Amino acid sequence: MISAIDALNNWEEAFSTDDAAPLQKMFTDDFVMIDSDGRRQSLDDVAGWATTEDFHIGDFDIIHDDDHCCCGTHSATLDGQDIGTVCFFALKSQGRISLWKIQRTPPSEE
């Protein structure tokens, strides 16, 4: 069973190497991602932007992680700029992730 920290590390590996393999190995064939705007994306959709955009994530805080689901928060940057904090929720199935839902909070303007 994949852990939340392993999943987040796989995301960062895909972002850092422009290689979708870490995502493909952790997501189910019927994987769905739902972004902050409610848009649903398939594995192919996610692999497209995850390997072409300059995203990075860090500051992982795992709130819950068991055999069925996980959730937590992480920081996110795009092109070196802070784009806020992301809250994620994932459903697990057959040892992999079948759903990844995010809600991003933009950085505060000071």
Each language-model region and where it sits:
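Short, low-complexity N-terminal intrinsically disordered segments enriched in polar/charged residues
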Residues: 1-21, 25, 29, 109
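A beta-strand edge to alpha-helix "cap/lid" segment located at domain peripheries
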Residues: 5-7, 34-36, 40-110
